[in-house]
Swiss-Prot record:
Top-rank taxon: Bacteria
Reported cofactor(s): Mg(2+)
Binding site for CTP: 32, 35, 116, 159, 162, 165, 168
Subunit structure as annotated in this protein's UniProt entry: Homodimer.
Protein species of origin: Lacticaseibacillus paracasei (strain ATCC 334 / BCRC 17002 / CCUG 31169 / CIP 107868 / KCTC 3260 / NRRL B-441) (Lactobacillus paracasei)
Further comment found in the protein's record: A single active site specifically recognizes both ATP and CTP and is responsible for their addition.
Name this polypeptide is given: CCA-adding enzyme
MF-aspect GO terms: ATP binding; CCA tRNA nucleotidyltransferase activity; magnesium ion binding; tRNA binding
């Protein structure tokens, strides 16, 4: 079988493979780009593996950068876009269950491929498109199956993050996990505690937005990986409930986290801080969960306080929780608000001061009451109508 290499990212990198081969070494496309190209998915980073050692790559090409030379990776810059070329290697013991204690450069493609995580990621492609498949990766791609290369227990002891990658790929690609590989995840789930929260979160985030979220979550639960993830151990019931929701692919990470946290009935700040998520995500999920608590019939003030992003996110989550929920009606209700932020309010504190109102708590309270009444439609958003009412409310004149 040959892979069509006319995609721009591959096509642009073919001269690099040819130049390495012309110097007497082997060079192949490897990794996720090969897998995704075979599946007909968009490809992203193109990785190249070679029998040439780093010093030899640097002699072959005029412009290079040492991006990870201790692990055999050199960035080749000769052809515009940089391409990482990594020397074939074997790895020794993994005492921290994440990084090898020692890396040895080798000349054998087979030795390099057998250390990889799953068979679908252990394919190599020559510059003419010829596919090298030493571990039946093509067969597993055909059957939509995730299977560890060689002994799965060894693969997960080498790098415990691979277990999270398995459930992430299950969701992202819509693949199933081969029974022996799944059993090995269950046997080794406790090793996940050795992996940094950031790395675990990166995989879980991608699981939440995959095309088969249910399958990924179900195996996350069945293999007990969840028990070793931040703040998840006590929430098997809610996680199971989450995994049973319709498998509609979510459009945003915030929707996934908001749905999960709403079902967990836990504080968004506590959970998301434990998972080391961004402040931006924490704010949006917090606003969304607050709105979900008054759904499906929020007031105009609820919608106004939530803001457009949280309304959109809550709408998607509510549709997941209640399939007959009318998202269009919610969108129209938000769009129909007289104002959508305080900046749009016709009355300001400066207007009140100019009218003789003393700055202070009374003025702030009056402005807040005016804002709420305008949002509710009880008052028109017109300065000439709002100013006398707010002035009277303040009752604290100069």
């Amino acid at each position: 079988m040959r892979l069509d290499l006319t995609q721009p990212d591959f096509k642009a990198a073919i001269p690099i493979l040819k130049k390495i081969e012309a110097a007497g070494y082997e060079a192949y496309f490897v990794g996720g780009s090969v897998r995704d190209a075979i599946l007909g998915l968009p490809i992203h980073d193109v990785d190249i593996a070679s029998s040439a050692y780093p010093a030899e790559i640097k002699r072959i090409f005029k412009r290079t950068a040492d991006t990870g030379i201790e692990h055999g990776t050199v960035m080749v810059l000769d052809h515009g876009t940089g391409y990482e070329v990594t020397t074939f290697r074997t790895e020794s013991r993994y005492q921290d269950f994440r990084r090898p204690d020692h890396v040895t450069f080798v000349r054998s493609l087979a030795e390099d491929l057998k250390r990889r995580d799953f068979t679908i990621n252990a394919l190599a492609v020559r510059h003419d498109g010829t596919i090298i498949d030493l571990f039946d990766g093509l067969k597993d791609l055909q059957h939509h199956q995730l299977r560890a290369v060689g002994n799965p227990h060894e693969r997960f002891h080498e790098d415990a993050l691979r277990m999270m990658r398995a459930v992430r790929f299950e969701s992202q690609l819509g693949f199933g996990i081969e029974p022996a590989t799944k059993a090995a995840i269950a046997d080794n789930a406790k090793l996940l505690v050795h992996i940094s929260v950031e790395r675990v979160a990166a995989e879980f985030n991608r699981l939440l937005t995959g095309i088969d979220r249910r399958a990924g979550l179900q195996d996350f639960i069945e293999t007990r990986l969840f028990a070793y993830a931040p703040k998840m151990a006590a929430h098997e019931t809610a996680l199971t409930q989450f995994s049973q929701l319709p498998d509609t692919q979510l459009t945003s990470l915030a929707s996934g986290w908001a749905a999960l946290i709403f079902l967990l009935r836990t504080q968004p700040l506590v959970m998301l801080k434990a998972w080391k998520q961004s402040n931006e995500l924490i704010t949006l999920v917090t606003q969304t969960v607050k709105l979900l608590q008054v759904m499906p019939n929020p007031t105009a003030w609820d919608l106004y306080q939530a803001g457009e992003a949280a309304v959109t996110t809550a709408s998607e989550v509510q549709k997941l929780l209640t399939p007959d929920f009318d998202q269009q009606q919610l969108a129209e209700a938000y769009a129909a608000l007289p104002i959508h932020s305080k900046k749009e309010l016709a009355l300001t504190g400066a207007d009140l001061i100019k009218a003789g109102v003393r700055p202070g708590p009374a003025m702030g309270k009056a402005l807040n009451q005016i804002e709420q009444r305008v949002v509710a439609g009880a008052l028109p958003n017109e300065l000439k109508k709002l100013l006398p009412i707010a002035t009277e409310m303040s009752q604290d004149r100069l």
